[in-house]
Swiss-Prot record:
Gene: DPYSL3
Region named Disordered: 506-570
The protein's name in its UniProt record: Dihydropyrimidinase-related protein 3
In-chain residues carrying the UniProt-annotated modification Phosphotyrosine: Y431, Y499
Protein task: Necessary for signaling by class 3 semaphorins and subsequent remodeling of the cytoskeleton. Plays a role in axon guidance, neuronal growth cone collapse and cell migration.
One BP annotation, GO: positive regulation of neuron projection development
Pfam families associated with the record: Amidohydro_1 (PF01979)
Residue numbers bearing the Phosphothreonine modification: T509, T514, T543
Chief location category: cytoplasm
Family (UniProt): Belongs to the metallo-dependent hydrolases superfamily. Hydantoinase/dihydropyrimidinase family.
Keywords: Cell projection, Cytoplasm, Phosphoprotein
Modified how: Phosphorylation on Ser-522 by DYRK2 promotes subsequent phosphorylation on Thr-509, Thr-514 and Ser-518 by GSK3.
Naturally occurring in which organism (per UniProt): Homo sapiens (Human)
Top-level taxonomy: Eukaryota, Metazoa, Chordata, Craniata, Vertebrata
A molecular function (GO) term: identical protein binding
Subunit structure: Homotetramer, and heterotetramer with CRMP1, DPYSL2, DPYSL4 or DPYSL5. Interacts with synaptic vesicle protein 2 and SH3A domain of intersectin. Interacts with FLNA.
Amino acid sequence: MSYQGKKNIPRITSDRLLIKGGRIVNDDQSFYADIYMEDGLIKQIGDNLIVPGGVKTIEANGKMVIPGGIDVHTHFQMPYKGMTTVDDFFQGTKAALAGGTTMIIDHVVPEPESSLTEAYEKWREWADGKSCCDYALHVDITHWNDSVKQEVQNLIKDKGVNSFMVYMAYKDLYQVSNTELYEIFTCLGELGAIAQVHAENGDIIAQEQTRMLEMGITGPEGHVLSRPEELEAEAVFRAITIASQTNCPLYVTKVMSKSAADLISQARKKGNVVFGEPITASLGIDGTHYWSKNWAKAAAFVTSPPLSPDPTTPDYINSLLASGDLQLSGSAHCTFSTAQKAIGKDNFTAIPEGTNGVEERMSVIWDKAVATGKMDENQFVAVTSTNAAKIFNLYPRKGRISVGSDSDLVIWDPDAVKIVSAKNHQSAAEYNIFEGMELRGAPLVVICQGKIMLEDGNLHVTQGAGRFIPCSPFSDYVYKRIKARRKMADLHAVPRGMYDGPVFDLTTTPKGGTPAGSARGSPTRPNPPVRNLHQSGFSLSGTQVDEGVRSASKRIVAPPGGRSNITSLS
């Protein structure tokens, strides 16, 4: 049962659990074995296990047993312009568990010019009191100066944060400059953290938004029209370039378009340390809904970068996720009510951005990628759990079924079929962007911290039972290549003697003035004579005074063998 609203609920006490007859699926192998769990950890894996009494046995009946999902991108209980998203940490993590996700990583979004540490502590207080599953935190850098740099160092050293997001969009609010990007990436690379980017060209978006409003386009379609995918792609390319120059690992959040996905794929093939995170929405649906006649429906899809209006985009992004060109998945779950979205009913730039997806994420990927033959079950585990654990330095505690790992497990039924509906989803949002979609693949049993959270379609969650899981810096999965490159890229000056030859005398020219004679033209070529325009023989009609007179500066070149009768150069 749910304990929402009750105070001082004790944390979950772990049960002794035995899963029998399941097929264990990790990212690198699948095999049949039983699993014994105690005190929130996996204690034994194998056949004919000897276990103590008082064990609850779960018959898997040959079904897949996979590591619990890790959703790397959520926005629960996020403040926005005096409002708060409708899914707080209780409702949001409850929805996560219903979909097979046993850990989330939420974004701390400090107000511009405010303290990152204070915002972090606020998020910790909210999540500790309400989260039903384990969680970690990213911290967004919404401004940059020496004080923020010191806070970043402290958050990494003392607070268990190893990832920070910067915004290349939201001009005059969160957007940072290229110089600041360079400084932030340099700082994070030295500290062993992961640089995340929201990649869009904010300057051009601001211009396009103004243009759309001047044209009278005020509805949700204006959102996607003012943010074409080229602006996402340009920012991705720029971020990859700056990250490469600073030797900092780059993580692109919310990959929404073919162009952005292709750039990440190409950069990885060239050896760049870059990771791409598509979200439930970009994997499961397209942006044609922005043109819906129903304003509330169209507004429900507003998120940034926007969903692509190209209906072939989800299939394309799933293919890149299946092939490993994109590495992991999040939901970017950020839900507002229709009334909250309606503050932008007359101006699309004021519509609060965000879509649902934490509950649907794993089923969407199974249906769109595994059931269609693009992806095997092991890659499914990789992109929904294991790769996230490796990138954020949680592996093998999370993201793997092995002795000593946390007992966060899901018995997955590949044959289950469910129809998505806002009437029965766990989110508090009135609208579900996947409404009516039939999805193959669903969790039968969800175990978190060794406790059964979902069984027989019923949730058994406890508010505040989730633990904060600290993420340490210098993840091997991310930084082994970075460290090797630092050794190879050790720069040294070339030893040479002092130059003692002549030095050209460069006279400084006042700004806007005429350059001095010594600075005009090429130093290796004499300056040509200057014609006095007031004495020119040029006329608007008729022959010119100097017509037929060959200029001393004109070179006449004859072809080899002399002039031909075909071409006259005289």
